[in-house]
From Swiss-Prot:
Record's keyword terms, sorted: ATP-binding, Ligase, Magnesium, Manganese, Metal-binding, Nucleotide-binding, Purine biosynthesis
Taxonomy of the source species: Bacteria, Pseudomonadati, Pseudomonadota, Gammaproteobacteria, Lysobacterales
Residues involved in ATP binding: 135-196
GO biological process: 'de novo' IMP biosynthetic process; purine nucleobase biosynthetic process
UniProt KW Nucleotide-binding keyword: yes
Organism: Xylella fastidiosa (strain Temecula1 / ATCC 700964)
SMART domains from the UniProt entry: GARS_A, GARS_C
Pathways involved: Purine metabolism; IMP biosynthesis via de novo pathway; N(1)-(5-phospho-D-ribosyl)glycinamide from 5-phospho-alpha-D-ribose 1-diphosphate: step 2/2
Listed EC numbers: 6.3.4.13
Entry protein name: Phosphoribosylamine--glycine ligase
């Protein structure tokens, strides 16, 4: 079977790596891919960008692709699934209408309010003065979100009213996020611990994937600006069996049912970013309509089932007939980034050490490319995700950072504390 995977990040490299394990997969085309997917078994890159929907469809048709899997949110929100389905091509992901769960935070908040899905109190504004008046009335801390897609960076957790006002002006007047910031969502600040809860959905049924926890802030101790994610581990210990059941009952299943009721049934990876309070009550911080990045990398390290089998079950509406099997050992991934990410990174630097990695480490490429000499060079902000399994999170962290120590380029940096919450729990249990 020939597959097309759309995207160029660490998430796509991890999906491709896992799909290539399937005996039924003969070849995977990755568009546009990166230096890691270019050298992965059964894989080759195609130079078609994720925003070129016509080019991607033409590629899939020319190559007689059996199934297409979409990694990033941009083509999903742009309607790539609608485009492929209209041409009779099998593709796994939500339609443009269903992808509004991520494409518009205001849409997602209204959807949750309409269907009784627990989330933070909120208000939507397009006027600067009205938004600032709202913030002054509520006080800080408070959360300011750009309505549209902003590559994971359109959320400001303002600890003061002054900071909140500046964020509002940047988004609504200063064009900080372009069209994505033409409308803002102001939310109450939620206390608790975050977790990523990702499910495969076939339109009617949801199959939960392994839980995970991301590290959004750029610096150790969870300080500094938000990023697309600086590392993740799986499973998330905060999600106990009881909380897991509650998330399915109160959030995932009502979301799937609500999308059907609204006439926009959801198929694809449904990502619920959660806040779990001290009482174990989950609330939705955000919905994404695709697998998380970097959560995909440690989650795929643990998946023992054939990913192609699961995707086919979803395409056939049969997710209620399958189960996903997981390695019981935790996994952890450390993102190595290029300074001064999340600002515009320095690119084109040669990465050394990729051929001298410990055997227990898997490196998933994100912002990488091959130069004219065939060397792997940096090509983005988040460059690599160094991932490993362990008997516990402490060991997985040790293995992953052992891999990080082998890799070098001039402007590399990474957090040194990925997994700290889980490790603190492990030490407390002892």
């Amino acid at each position: 079977m020939k597959l097309l995977v759309i995207g160029s990040g660490g998430r796509e490299h991890a999906l491709v790596w896992k799909l290539a394990h399937s005996r039924r997969v003969s070849e995977i085309i990755v568009a546009p891919g990166n230096a890691g997917t270019a050298t992965e078994t059964k894989c080759r890159n195609a130079p078609v960008q994720v925003t070129d929907l016509d080019g991607l469809l033409a590629l899939a048709q020319r190559e007689a692709v059996n199934i297409t899997v979409v990694g990033p949110e941009v083509p999903l929100v742009a309607g790539i699934v609608d485009c492929f389905r209209a041409a009779g091509m099998r593709i796994f992901g939500p339609t443009a209408a269903a992808a509004q769960l991520e494409g518009s935070k205001a849409y997602a908040k209204d959807f949750m309010a309409r269907h009784g899905i627990p989330t933070a109190r909120y208000a939507v504004h397009t006027n600067v003065d009205a938004a600032i008046s709202d913030v002054r009335q509520q006080g800080a801390p408070i959360v300011i979100k750009a309505d549209g897609l902003a590559a994971g960076k359109g959320v400001i957790v303002a600890m003061t009213v002054t900071e909140a006002e500046a964020a509002i002006r940047d988004m609504l007047s200063g064009n900080a996020f372009g069209h994505a910031g033409a409308r803002v969502v102001i939310e109450e600040y939620l206390d608790g611990e975050e977790a990523s809860f990702i499910s495969m959905v076939d339109g009617t049924h949801a199959l939960p994937m392994a839980t995970s926890q991301d590290h959004k802030r750029v610096s150790d101790g969870d300080i500094g600006p938000n990023t697309g994610g600086m590392g993740a581990y799986s499973p998330a210990p905060i999600i106990t069996d009881e909380i897991h059941a509650r998330v399915m009952r109160e959030i995932v299943n009502p979301t799937v049912a609500g999308m059907i009721a609204d006439g926009t049934p959801f198929m694809g990876f449904l990502y619920a970013g959660l806040m779990i309070d001290v009482h174990g009550a989950p609330k939705v911080i955000e919905f994404n309509v695709r697998f998380g990045d970097p959560e995909t990398q440690p989650v795929m390290m643990r998946l023992q089932s054939d990913l192609l089998d699961l995707i086919e079950a979803a395409l056939n509406g049969d997710l209620d007939k399958v189960q996903a099997q997981w390695d019981p050992h935790p996994s952890l991934g450390v993102v190595m980034a290029a300074r001064p990410y999340p600002e515009m990174p320095i690119t084109g630097e040669v990465i050394s050490g990729l051929d001298a990695l410990p055997a227990n480490v898997k490196v998933f490429h994100a912002g990488t490319a091959l130069d004219v000499a065939g060397r792997v060079v940096t090509a983005g902000g988040r460059v690599l995700c160094v991932t490993a399994l362990g008997s516990n999170v402490s060991e997985a962290q040790r293995h992953a950072y052992g891999g990080v120590a082998s890799l070098h380029w001039a402007n590399a940096f990474q957090r040194s504390d990925i997994g700290w919450r889980a490790i603190m729990r492990e030490h407390t249990v002892r």
